Amino acid sequence: MHRVVSLFAIVTCVAGIVSSAVAAPPEIRLWPQGMPEPVIPAAPPEKVEKSADGIQRRTNVSQPRLFVYEPPAGVKRTGAAVIVVPGGGFGVLADEHEGSDAAEWLAKNGIVGFQLAHRAPTNKHPSPNAGPAQDLQKAVIEVRRHAAEFKVDPQQVGILGFSAGGQVTLVAATNDRKFQSEEIAESHKPDFLLLLYAYQIYDPKTKGLRADILLDGGLPPTFIAQMGDDRGSLPQGSTLLYLELINRNIPAEIHIYEKGGHGFGMRSRPGATGPTDWQLRAIDWLRLRGYATAP
């Protein structure tokens, strides 16, 4: 009996180790030779915690990197890639329901998902989005550098930004490259964008978009989803962004739902259709452009 139990324990242990190894996605470090300022100290160490509200939060990120989620066996690759930028108010990264869950969802639809872990916290910096925007620009470059490895078309690299990640996405995409640390041939400009309740992109004082979103620099085709009752990211920002895009003849689509609040990511909300419906609309939008597999 003892021998059977011991054997069972060994098999279970080995299976757990193998399962854990398989579950861990590959990583791409963004700044192996050192990142530009502002630098996040290595201490305290990086921490990932899930609290009582069921939200996983990552913080103390001193080594920005990408986690790679490839389409599973049997799913046809489209050649597209999407970098997922979680929200978290620049203090933490909500990197499960606004990160890995989204990357896995994209992978199931034939898209290689790259989850960004940008430097954090930066919420006490003079410009909280500056470091994360550098990381995102470098992430786009690194995805193009690794295009052959992950069977990605370097001209089909998009970004999906949630909340603060949406703000970072717009700043990174509309500004010139924010670092000069090395010779770079690849462009940091994405080929398409998906924005979910982008955080504080509306300036109530000017009744316009925030000053560091430079739309005259150009944006690619953009999908926007927003909840009308969102008090964390006001719907005026998403609406104004959409109007600015169509006034510039940039292909854009927007979905505004009555209810759903803020920060739902890939999760449903009781009594609200928006938090799940946007996923269907986004996949339709991606399919029309050949970025996602047919149903």
Model-identified regions with their sequence ranges:
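Short amphipathic alpha-helix adjacent to the substrate-entry channel of hydrolases
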Residues: 95-114
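C-terminal catalytic histidine-bearing segment of alpha/beta-hydrolase fold enzymes
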Residues: 239-242, 246-295
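Short beta-strand element of the alpha/beta-hydrolase
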Residues: 78-87
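N-terminal cap/lid segment of alpha/beta-hydrolase-fold proteins
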Residues: 24-77
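Short beta-strand/loop motif that positions the catalytic acidic residue
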Residues: 218, 223-226
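Primarily recognizes the serine-hydrolase "nucleophile elbow" in alpha/beta-hydrolase
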Residues: 134-217
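Conserved alpha/beta-hydrolase "acid-adjacent" motif
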Residues: 231-240
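Catalytic nucleophile-loop/oxyanion-hole region of alpha/beta-hydrolase
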Residues: 94-95, 101, 118-151, 267-275
